[in-house]
Swiss-Prot record:
Residues 1-19, 26-40 have a biased composition (Basic residues). Residues 1-53 are annotated as: Disordered. GO terms for biological process: translation. HAMAP family: Ribosomal_bL34. It comes from the Bacteria. This is Large ribosomal subunit protein bL34. Residues 41-53 have a biased composition (Low complexity). It comes from Chlorobaculum tepidum (strain ATCC 49652 / DSM 12025 / NBRC 103806 / TLS). Keywords: Ribonucleoprotein, Ribosomal protein. Belongs to the bacterial ribosomal protein bL34 family.
Length: 53
């Protein structure tokens, strides 16, 4: 039986990335909540771009 989690960085970025969060009102709410909480990484893509460099 195939497991449910089949990791793919492209899908991860496109579904949970920074641009995707900014696209909707609720996504922006998520980002502001994470900023208020002082999260080290706001979204998936912001942490991924740092690891690529």
């Amino acid at each position: 039986m195939k497991r449910t989690f089949q990791p793919s960085n492209r899908k991860r970025r496109n579904k949970h990335g920074f641009r995707q969060r900014m696209a909707t009102k609720n996504g922006r709410k998520v980002l502001s909540a994470r900023r208020a909480k002082g999260r080290h990484s706001l979204s998936v893509s912001s942490s991924m771009s740092a690891s690529k460099r």
